[in-house]
């Protein structure tokens, strides 16, 4: 981009564990490039200004840093004040003519939080030793795995409708403030999002992507809010859905259909270059037997008894007999997922039950380990619940214990959680690629996006099911990109 004059000082931000991997790939393509790489230590409080000074005064072909480091680069007080005031104005607009009391209450709470944040900002003393993002000279931003910033605050009258983003995150708000600044500065350009899942489990996520990348185009069309976008391009429907307890059904309003889809895609394609696997003609290995292998286990008597307790808890909540602080549907969903994985996660005093999922997975891993022994083929095991913890029972350590008992050497088993720094992760990934580590366990958040370990990959195991289909896609990309091993 710099050679073509598109950008003077481009910044690439990637998931925390991919900084070194990205830099390595960049140097493979451009061995003589002048790249500034931000390590975790560079953004420690005492070193932050020094590194920001390097960005400001240096001439680089690219700057590469982690998502979390990027968030530590502040905007000026004036820009942040303007940003917060704009959000407050959007809430006031959404509150007009609103009759739904719960939605009014939600919007008012959001407004009060913003007003408190604004008050704190205005009362804070200027920091003379801080270099703001605007002062660094960065004029182009590339965001890898941009879907991780989807939880951008939406001011809407549809808060009680499923399929509308109901949460907001500070990092999404921070990114939006910076992309807004760059788009204004670069006349609608200067920002690129890279993601394989721009929409994962909510239609409103498409609006968020458009708000990030083409707010000026939406405004030219007279679309200034999510509600105006939804009334033009989406439809609220009533649908019959399984109750969270798993016992019975309920009617739920959901934003589930697009309207005027050709027009919507025409607008989105003004900023989106969409490529599918078929478009790119990527070499994709065939899954054994043409589809995933599902291993269904019969529930133990203990698990069936526990699920009946879940149903009774759900019914008590629906009748209003329980204080939400004591029990609620979120707790029930969490406990149900834990119990389905291993009952010891909800009651540590229990022994291993019949048809333990940990043992069933370990048996499959051991079988594949034997089959791939000569070629040193590897297996990746995903589990988002019950990650390693020395103080309590967890599925990771249970699987490892069983595998060692079966005969797999301990040094051939590892967790992504054991690699704390970027350098450690790079070394660990190389060991997996070389087949030194043959059973590698991790979670979607730490290992799901962009992890390059597929060279000798034979099998990928899903121990638990994540909430979003996009998380399954993120997990399986390692297998899709892998060479085919038999």
Task: Give residue spans per PLM region.
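Conserved SF1/SF2 helicase motif Ia
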Residues: 1-23, 185-190
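Conserved helix-turn-beta segment of the N-terminal RecA-like "Helicase ATP-binding" lobe
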Residues: 18-43, 54, 213-217
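Inter-lobe coupling linker of SF2 helicases/translocases
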Residues: 48-93, 102, 109, 113-140, ...
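A short beta-strand element within the Helicase C-terminal
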Residues: 205-208, 451-465
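Conserved strand-helix element at the start of the C-terminal RecA-like helicase core
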Residues: 322-329, 374-397
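Conserved helicase motor "Helicase C" RecA-like lobe of SF1/SF2 P-loop NTPases
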Residues: 385-415
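Conserved helicase ATPase core of P-loop NTP-dependent helicases/translocases
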Residues: 409-444
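Conserved SF2 helicase motif VI
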Residues: 468-486
